[in-house]
Amino acid sequence: MRGAMELEPELLLQEARENVEAAQSYRRELGHRLEGLREARRQIKESASQTRDVLKQHFNDLKGTLGKLLDERLVTLLQEVDTIEQETIKPLDDCQKLIEHGVNTAEDLVREGEIAMLGGVGEENEKLWSFTKKASHIQLDSLPEVPLLVDVPCLSAQLDDSILNIVKDHIFKHGTVASRPPVQIEELIEKPGGIIVRWCKVDDDFTAQDYRLQFRKCTSNHFEDVYVGSETEFIVLHIDPNVDYQFRVCARGDGRQEWSPWSVPQIGHSTLVPHEWTAGFEGYSLSSRRNIALRNDSESSGVLYSRAPTYFCGQTLTFRVETVGQPDRRDSIGVCAEKQDGYDSLQRDQAVCISTNGAVFVNGKEMTNQLPAVTSGSTVTFDIEAVTLGTTSNNEGGHFKLRVTISSNNREVVFDWLLDQSCGSLYFGCSFFYPGWKVLVF
């Protein structure tokens, strides 16, 4: 009885500790949720503020542009009025000058005639004779024609008031406010030297024609375009390991020119070591990141291997052929358990590969199944999974079995690859006998 009573406080103490730990854990979780709420509130507040600024700026720009366009149109119309006025007034001015000249001539003639007549007949006959002679040379019955009012311009402005209704309708329909963008980033998948970005449409009423993906380092202020097209997935290459990047996507509606608002930016990074070719091999020139190999015109031959065994089972290894040269049946692109110098091709033991003609080799033996020939732009992928980790039967002739899937040009072959011993990671390599072949690995 006493032992039970002594034990009871210990149990109570233990239970109290557990309750305290549970309460601490609960408090931490609630703290995380509070932080999540703060982030959500911040996103709403900041996006609302940004949207207000965008709307104000846009409509101010619109008002300025419309005012400028209206002013320019007014100036054009006023210039047309000036031109018509000047062109049609000139004939009237000429006619007025002619009439005024006739009036002056007639007034002079009247004065001369009256003076001549004051002298009467006799000694003033000479003046009368001179006046009569002068008057006979002036066509007093010839009057210039003055145009009727119906025959001269009467300027007016034709202004269609319906434009106000048209503009009003467009203005009332101009712009929308959306509570969320029509597309969002769905998933970020790390790859060696890259990140696969997948996005999806979240607005069922929005019909997307194209998507636009941008990214930047989190330390940068500038996003840059990395993909524009109709696909909903893209691998962003040249990603530095263990560096945070920000991604965002938008869409363009069917038949529209403008892009939708950007999705909520997502942060991702890759912890995987980038795939690199071995530098310094005489027959190949490498890019600055050493993920692109170009077969140069050096006479040196052999297999160009990866710098390290960076391919692990369960991953997808991708080779993209950027340019092609003259094919040779000994060409090879593939993976191997270890580097072996002295070989001109991966068509050897402890390696699997595809030749540029599409032939598949496993441990140096050509398979019956064949893939399409490799061309410029072709993508060849290797997916390898461990099948057995223990010793297999002697009939299989190996100790470690891997299941390999090689895909190229929408075709694939699947087979088991037997190795002498287990290996946690694999090398990759390529060999080309003629220059011009360029291969990107990721």
From Swiss-Prot:
Biological processes annotated in GO: negative regulation of cell growth; negative regulation of G1/S transition of mitotic cell cycle; positive regulation of DNA-templated transcription; positive regulation of receptor signaling pathway via JAK-STAT; positive regulation of transcription by RNA polymerase II
Domain called Fibronectin type-III: residue spans: 181-274
UniProt-listed CDD domains: FN3
GO cellular component entries: cytoplasm; cytosol; nucleus; plasma membrane
Tissue expression: Expressed in several embryonic and adult tissues, including adult and fetal brain, liver, spleen and pancreas. Expressed in adult, but not fetal kidney. Expressed in skin and squamous cell carcinoma (SCC) and in several other cancer types. Also detected in lesion actinic keratosis (AK).
UniProt feature coiled coil, ranges: 10-57
InterPro entries: FN3_dom, FN3_sf, Ig-like_fold
Location within or outside the cell: Cytoplasm
Record key words, sorted: Acetylation, Coiled coil, Cytoplasm
Main function: May play a role in the negative regulation of cell cycle progression.
Similarity section: Belongs to the cytokine receptor-like factor 3 family.
Name of the protein in its database record: Cytokine receptor-like factor 3
Organism: Homo sapiens (Human)
Gene field: CRLF3
